[in-house]
């Protein structure tokens, strides 16, 4: 039995996330799409935890502290970071960084859209005022550019190695 009925998000039948994490930053997003993105399960064997439950959020903080202490960790990788409720995740990052100022937390925010990726980096000047407190994000746009550049011999202005250059030149949208 779950400690609380709302420990995980539950629907009458299995409901998968819509994977539209752009709804987190879209002031015009439908509440339906946002709720499905945050609350839908990633897969049948991967329930979506409900970090809006304050007891679960506290457990999640203590769980991270235990692992950091037990394994002497310098950093954490958070899979599918934007699929969680963003406010509790921000509180989680903030709490861990208050306890461990030199800890690095990297969020997997798998998108090729650079402005949407930048939204998730802590300290970014997001228009909605939201701060994730997430120190690091995985640079999937650079990964995609490198894969594309290294798989062609093209010297056209929009292909090959220039893809890497242009992606790195877009670093101005990131906080740090």
Residue ranges of model-derived segments:
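Substrate-binding/active-site clefts of carbohydrate-active enzymes
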Residues: 1-70, 91-99, 104, 115-116, ...
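Sequence-level motif detector for i,i+2 pairs with an aromatic at +2
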Residues: 44, 175-176
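Active-site-proximal helices and loops of the catalytic beta/alpha 8
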Residues: 63-75, 80-175
């Amino acid at each position: 039995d779950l400690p609380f009925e709302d420990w995980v998000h539950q629907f009458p039948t299995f409901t998968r996330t819509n994977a539209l994490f752009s709804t987190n930053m879209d002031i015009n997003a439908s509440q339906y799409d946002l709720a499905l993105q945050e609350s839908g399960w990633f897969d049948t064997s991967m329930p979506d935890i409900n970090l809006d439950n304050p007891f679960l959020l506290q457990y999640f903080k203590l769980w991270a502290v235990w692992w950091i202490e037990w394994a002497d960790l310098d950093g954490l990788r958070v899979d599918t970071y934007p699929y969680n409720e963003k406010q509790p995740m921000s509180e989680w990052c903030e709490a861990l960084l208050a306890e461990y100022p030199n800890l690095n937390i990297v969020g997997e925010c798998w998108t090729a859209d650079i402005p949407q990726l930048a939204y998730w980096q802590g300290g970014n000047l997001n228009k909605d005022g939201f701060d994730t407190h997430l120190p690091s994000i995985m640079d999937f746009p650079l990964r995609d550019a490198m894969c594309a550049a290294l798989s062609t011999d093209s010297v056209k202005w929009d292909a090959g190695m220039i893809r890497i250059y242009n992606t790195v030149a877009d670093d101005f949208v990131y906080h740090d």
